[in-house]
């Protein structure tokens, strides 16, 4: 009986995922896709409809002869996913319907003094949950810029200052024990979204997130390597300068330390850019470079050289056909990307780097 229940649960999950991925799919198509009998599929679909996970939208036009099939969709009206993105100085929060619509979103500031786990917990229960109403929370996702060691229930992030000895995972599990809950790496989430919504057709590609932290996610044969915990690579802590500045990880000259958003002020000043003239505003280095500012061009080129050295080594190790650059790095504009494309060709294994295309997210 237990085995049968487990098989049925797996089949329910499979049916739901297929409906979620294929808008307007029919029972007949589900039967063909899953190799399950039509009565079995109908029974599974009926259970998902009764429990308000799916809706039957009635008959739709079909090229086939005979009775027209009924269209199935996920029930976005009744089901939500809660998402909390843990950043250094704020929480980005959202409630997403099962059919991928934003029902609610906000930003919650964080201070250095606050206990971040307590803040996240109170944000969920006091701000997000009241917005849910009678709808169902299908799951809670907490996204972090760091490594998630699910097996040992540990996370490590130099960006938000969490170490392996901090009992963050255990505290979250205790706080959210009544809800399906997961921790996800931010770069893995961005990469998956790129793969699904930007229609990436390359089976082997790398997504590089250049923000305050720098991370990479690798896809091989259309599959994310080692899941969404950020354990496949610590690209941001590859050293591009062994004599470079000290990184929070204890290494010197890490990509994150010299190319990440937190390094921009230091590097801009080193290139002779007078930041006092911006009076608290963020400098738009892309616009400055396009307007011919020599110092801004020097800054962007230097950043591209350092990032390209790391990318070329990643290409030599992994041999992707595509590298997608996302995050705040895209704000450095076309001059940054063109320099990356040029500089990648100057290092790494020529046969690999010459067959890899780089583009923005």
Regions found by a protein language model. Give the residues of each.
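Short, acidic Gly/Pro/Ser/Thr-rich loop/turn segments
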Residues: 89-91, 147-149, 215
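Short glycine-rich anion-binding loops that position phosphate/pyrophosphate groups of nucleotides
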Residues: 145-148, 211-213, 329
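Glycine/GP-enriched mid-protein hinge/lid loop-to-helix segment characteristic of carbohydrate kinases
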Residues: 105, 116, 179-287
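Acidic-glycine-rich active-site phosphate/pyrophosphate-binding loop
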Residues: 170, 226, 231-240, 341-351
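ATP-binding/phosphotransfer module of carbohydrate and carboxylate kinases, centering on a glycine-rich
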Residues: 1-66, 71-136, 255-361
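Glycine-rich phosphate-binding loop and adjoining helix at the ATP-binding site
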Residues: 103-204, 334-345
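Short, acidic, Ser/Thr-enriched surface-loop or helix-capping motifs
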Residues: 97, 150, 219-220
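Short glycine-aspartate micro-motif
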Residues: 71, 81-85, 137-141, 205-209, ...
């Amino acid at each position: 009986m237990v085995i049968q229940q487990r098989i049925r649960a797996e089949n329910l999950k499979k049916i739901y995922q297929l409906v979620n991925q294929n808008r307007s799919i029919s029972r007949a198509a589900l039967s063909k896709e899953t190799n399950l009998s039509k009565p079995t599929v109908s029974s599974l679909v009926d259970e998902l409809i009764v429990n308000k996970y799916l809706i039957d939208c009635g008959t739709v036009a079909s090229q086939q002869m005979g009775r027209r099939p009924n269209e199935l969709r996920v029930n976005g009206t009744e089901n939500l996913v809660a998402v909390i993105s843990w950043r250094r100085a704020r929480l980005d929060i959202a409630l997403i319907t099962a059919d991928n619509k934003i029902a609610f979103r906000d930003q919650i500031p964080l201070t250095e003094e606050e206990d971040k786990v307590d803040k996240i917990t109170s944000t969920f229960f006091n701000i997000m949950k009241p917005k849910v109403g009678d709808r169902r929370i299908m799951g809670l996702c907490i996204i972090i810029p760091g490594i998630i060691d699910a097996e040992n229930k540990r996370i490590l992030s130099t960006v938000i200052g969490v170490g392996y000895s901090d009992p963050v995972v255990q505290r979250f599990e205790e706080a959210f024990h009544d809800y399906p809950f997961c921790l996800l790496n931010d770069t893995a989430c961005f990469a998956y979204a790129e793969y699904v919504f930007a229609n990436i057709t390359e089976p082997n590609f790398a997504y590089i997130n250049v923000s305050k932290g720098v991370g990479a996610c690798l896809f091989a044969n259309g599959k994310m390597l080692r899941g969404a915990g950020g354990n496949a690579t610590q690209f941001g802590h590859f050293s591009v300068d062994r004599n470079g500045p000290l990184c929070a990880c204890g290494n010197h000259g890490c990509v994150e330390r010299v190319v990440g958003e937190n390094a921009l002020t230091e590097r801009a000043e080193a290139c002779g850019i007078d930041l006092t003239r911006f009076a608290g505003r963020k400098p738009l280095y892309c616009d400055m470079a396009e307007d011919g500012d020599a110092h801004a061009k020097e800054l962007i080129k230097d950043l591209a050289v350092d990032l390209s050295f790391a990318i070329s080594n990643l290409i030599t190790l992994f041999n992707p056909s595509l590298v997608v650059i996302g995050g705040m790095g895209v704000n450095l504009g076309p001059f940054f990307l063109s320099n990356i494309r040029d500089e990648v060709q100057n290092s790494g294994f020529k046969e690999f780097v010459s067959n890899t295309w780089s583009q923005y997210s």
